[in-house]
Amino acid sequence: MSLIKDKRLPADRLRRAADLEALGFKTTKGLDKLAGLVGQDRAVRSVGFGLSVQSKGYNIFMVGERGCGRTTYAMEELRRAAADMPAPDDWVYVYNFDDPSLPLAISLPAGKGRELAKDAEDAIEDLKTALSKAFDNNEFEDNKAQLVKSFQDEVNAIMEELRKWAESKDFAIKRTPQGFVNLPLIMAPPLSQPPRDEGQNEAGDKDEEGEKQLVRREMQQEEFEKLSEEQQETLHKVSEEISQKTLEKLRLIREREKELKEKIKELESQICRVAIAPILTELRAKHMPNEKLSRWLDDLTEDLIANFNVFLAAVRDDAAEIDFSRYEVNAFVSNNPRDGAPVVCETNPIYYNLVGKVDYENRQGNLYTDFRRITPGAMHRANGGFLLLDADELLRQFMSWDVLKRVLRYRELSIENLGEQLGYIPVSSLRPEPIPIDMKVVIVGTPYLYYLLNIYDPEFQKVFKIKAEFDSDMPRTAESEYQIAQFVAGFVVREGRLNFTVAAVGEVIEWASRLVEDRNKLSTQLNKIAEVLVESTAYAKAEGKKLVGVDHVRRALAEKIYRADMWEDKVLEEYRKGVICIDTEGSVVGQINGLTVSQLIDHSFGSPVRITANVFMGAEGVVNIEREVRMTGPIHNKGLMILTSYLGRMYARDFPLSVSARIAFEQTYGGIEGDSASSTELYCLISAIADIPLNQGIAVTGSVDQMGFIQPIGGVNEKIEGFFRYCKARGLTGEQGVIIPVQNEQHLMLNHEVTEAVKKNKFHIWSIATIDEGIEILTGIPAGARDENGNYSKESVHGRVQSALEGWLERSFRYKKLMADRVDPPKKRGKKKAAPEKGEEGLETKEAE
């Protein structure tokens, strides 16, 4: 019985308390907040190196579970690095006067993009005023009138020359609505006589010789018809000659008219240039030197000159709706020169949020867009700086991962319609000029996603060459405990919460060890710690306290468990009602309490399971009933095979192992996996073979190897606390407890209720290293060891097992002999021939088997 006492663990070894004196404060008030990241030296070095390398592909993938401070740390480090970097250039989109569907991208020094856009807007208004003044003054009108007068004089001279030449040919040129008409002239009496003067005779005027007066007039049709054919032909030829001459003169007039328009246009251009020169010169000088902008301003100048009348119309007609948008500037990406490089955290990385888009406006059912409606994406805004993304969110979005890789590989970003990426019929739209991209991308993700991308995406390693892995725990030292205290202090200041007492901080530190189930480590899942701080503060405020005490932290932890353990309570209720059959008192042969852990989404709990074993004569070996019905996994099956190996090593050195055994996990209706109950099954099997009862108040966990050494398991705290609740439900006897592997001592961070029960000797924890130690605790009988002859003491557990196995083997031989005698009596066997008959030989072979 000495092992029962010797292997008990005292209460102070069941939970590692925080060293409150070493923390050196009474409350977190005035305590320095945590600077940097706690317990992540590997990740810190990796991130620092990744940020220092500016080569292509050296982007960073921060690997770690959620809640370990990845995103917060990334933002802090990126902002720190960005502050020491120069602000990148601004980018603007402007109208392409050569091809409006291809807007031009122009880079400007940081802060100049919006300035240029504002200057362009102001310049448009200034140009309207300047052009209005230039073209409304007398000088322009006088110069224009002079040009028109010169043209008109020249036209008159040309027409006069043509008229005189035609008259010399006895023809007149007459303008009609249909054009010019050539009419022959003749000397003939007037077609109508004017009114007679007083004293004029009826015969008409006569000259001095008494002849009638003749005048030169146009020939009438009837007069032309009276001419001979020869005369008519002559007139036709002359008329044709005059028509040709007229056409020549008209062509000359048109040339002069064209020259007039060109002169007027040149005059207008000259005046326009003079008017706009100061405005554009100022704009150009303000944003120089920039070759691309200079070329665009040249194109803008020419377009202004060509369309100056549009400005005049807008000025002279207030109601006129004139579109001046093509002279505007789209301040696409703007950076503050005092802010350093940009740091962009895109929480919704859908395709258009990353690459930007072209917005459309609905105008009476028609979609309209222009370069002003080009909007930037996260990669545009992060250009020259850093882009932070969440891997899970990124991979959920269609095409986002592909476009990110493409930009990182080619360092250029084009704004494209997603439909075109899918190969749909392209829609007529803008195709903004691509912008060169130079940014460092930092992605935070889980280990699962990191390895998934490594396996299935061959391009992943080319664009994310730096892995920064975050650990979920850190060594528990005085320094790390103090860092947790600093985290609490920083949380109080940042969130405006109540300060914590040193005891409350100590409870938080201890819970951080429980999170990782290791008394020598602390969890780095700061978000879970922050949740406890928030909830503890809420309970303290509800009580009207000014400080958060240890009771508030304990209540917060208890309530957190209560909110999630409904299923655990229901299982315990079934045990109280006797539906789940678990014995926690007395001793039973071939029955033992194993321990399992049920893992829910947000809660895990331990509970006992009744394991039974039956043994009988035979040579089938150990058979697990759950395995036979395929309810067990490969690891559990491996543990079962180790049991057979152990039995053979311990008891079958001098004779064959002849036993049939059946082991079952009673009242289990789901799958069973893991080898943490292999030692428990072995105890149960030994009990059944040796017919030694096992203490039902002691539950067991731990795996075993072929040599009989106990191996560590997981979930030790949940298992102990789970069995404690079952024992407490029916009343603690002071003899109950749990046997655990010695290696699991370092993982013990039991709750205060269990540690108090152990302190009062109402519950016990035994720590063992071998099967022999465990069997002595369970039976109260020495396990036994082989003497110099290789035999066990008959009163020991191993001796009883060996005796039982030898007895079964002997009975088996007697049984076989008896069966052989029944088939072939001894007298008959003596008269047999030397060569047995075929049937008899088969019987002997079967019996031997």
Predicted regions and their residues:
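Peripheral, non-AAA+ core regions of ATP-driven protein-machinery
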Residues: 370, 376-379, 385-398, 402-404, ...
